[in-house]
Regions:
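Catalytic-loop region of hydrolases
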Residues: 28-109, 363
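Accessory cap/linker subdomain of secreted extracellular hydrolases
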Residues: 34-54, 235-332
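Short beta-strand/loop motif that positions the catalytic acidic residue
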Residues: 335, 340-347
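Histidine-bearing beta->alpha loop at or near hydrolase active sites
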Residues: 346, 367-388, 392
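Conserved alpha/beta-hydrolase "acid-adjacent" motif
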Residues: 348-354
Length: 407
């Protein structure tokens, strides 16, 4: 009799604990009013991070708050759209908050939904150029690259993977931000998804960087995700090699912006200490700009040289810069998922030799890889490869055998 009572008491206790856990989770998912499209993200309280203590109490990928996108920003193919803030982990292994945009099309089936994680090439040092901000203001030109997925009924999630501090070109912060954005979308009650939902990842340039790092980190950081494949192109495999290639050219802003972005993730790199007086002014200004929006980084710093703004002409070769670069250079883990890499041979920003080496590393470590070097294009036109990348992923969703041209 006593054993029966004890057993019933234990079961009741576990049920209460489970109920309390569920209640806590629901309470953490605060509902905010619909997005005010007139507010820029830098002036919007939704983007204010919870405290470090509040973040530490959540597991990676947990939803913290969410709100609906205004009807005017949805377009004809969408049933609803949401901004979701979630808990992630930065390069220093500290809990941080990030935001993803979840788009649910009218064509989405009631059950058996599939998820495309699209990584924007927003390359920004300000939240105002973030995918979530651009989706609200209808300035996100990249929607053309995943519109056909929406038309087929796929849910799309689009993380602000640089985080609330706009840490541009930071490997773990970006890759883990993507993976936790996927987790958050699966856990978001309005998405109609669950832990068994198949996921594909797609991105180009800065978005390719985030996609590639998510693929490299997935097995160790988020092994439970059912990722069917990743397609990425325009890859900045080695950030310092990219900086050296663009220094003094039209794309020079990418070098200077990357230095500022990395310094936000590595506060021990006090970049102002290395700057000339002109450089100190430029660093502050660069921190308000982005590559694909306004105020624009490329046009403001085209044809500038690092030596114009930094005291040491060998700044990129300094031991502290080389150490940071090693942490943010691809090819540290071989993804366990099928991959496609598409890369312009004539890319004026990303060294093709670095991408060749990355593909060779993956192949040598038994990756399933379709590597597609493309002639006759540059970095801008190379983005057209996203169409083929999406087709690659749709074939993986359909269960077709992944191509592999590793020799």
């Amino acid at each position: 009799m006593n054993r029966t009572v004890n057993r019933l008491t234990t079961i009741a206790g576990l049920a209460c604990a489970g109920a309390l856990s569920m209640t806590t989770l629901v309470q953490a998912q605060q509902v905010y009013p619909t997005v005010d499209a007139k507010l820029k993200p830098t002036a919007d309280a939704f983007y204010t991070s919870p405290t470090s203590g509040e973040l530490a109490a959540e597991v990676p990928g947990n939803v913290l708050r969410y709100r609906a996108l205004p009807a005017a920003s949805l377009g004809t193919s969408l049933k609803e759209g949401w901004q979701v803030m979630y808990r992630s982990t930065n390069t220093k292994n500290q809990p941080v908050a990030m935001v993803t945009t979840v788009l649910i099309p009218k064509a989405a089936p009631a059950t058996g939904r599939k998820l495309l994680s699209y990584q924007s090439f927003y390359d920004s040092l300000t939240l105002d150029c973030s995918p979530s901000g651009q989706a609200t203001s209808n300035t996100l030109l990249e929607k053309t690259f995943f519109q056909s997925a929406l038309n087929k009924g796929y849910i799309v999630t689009m993380a602000d993977y640089e985080g609330l501090e706009s840490q541009w070109i930071v490997a773990k912060n970006s890759g883990q931000g993507v993976l936790d954005g996927i987790r958050a979308t699966l856990r978001f009650s309005n998405s109609g998804l669950n832990a068994l939902t198949p996921v594909g990842m797609l991105g180009y340039s800065g978005g390719g960087f985030a996609t590639a790092w998510a693929a490299e980190l997935a097995a160790g950081y988020a092994p439970e995700l059912k990722i069917i494949g990743a397609a990425q192109g325009g890859l900045p495999v080695n950030p310092i090699n990219v900086a050296k290639k663009v220094d003094g050219g039209f794309w020079a802003g990418a070098y200077l912006g990357a230095v500022v972005g990395l310094s936000r993730a590595y506060p021990e790199l006090k970049v102002e200490d290395y700057a000339t007086p002109e450089g100190i002014v430029a660093i502050k200004d660069i921190g308000t700009r982005c590559l694909t929006g306004s105020p624009n980084l490329l046009t403001a710093y085209a044809y500038k040289k690092g030596s114009d703004l930094l005291k040491d002409p060998n700044f990129l070769n300094l031991p502290e810069m080389q150490a940071i670069n090693r942490e943010n250079t691809m090819g540290q883990n071989t993804p366990k998922i099928p991959l496609q890499i598409f890369q312009s041979i004539g890319d004026q920003v990303m060294p093709i030799a670095d991408v060749d080496s990355l593909a060779a590393y993956y192949c040598a470590n038994n990756a399933t890889l379709e590597y597609k070097p493309v002639a006759g294009t540059d970095h801008v036109l190379g983005a057209m490869g996203l169409s083929g990348g999406l087709t690659y992923l749709l074939n993986r969703f359909d269960g077709k055998v992944a191509p592999n041209n590793c020799k």
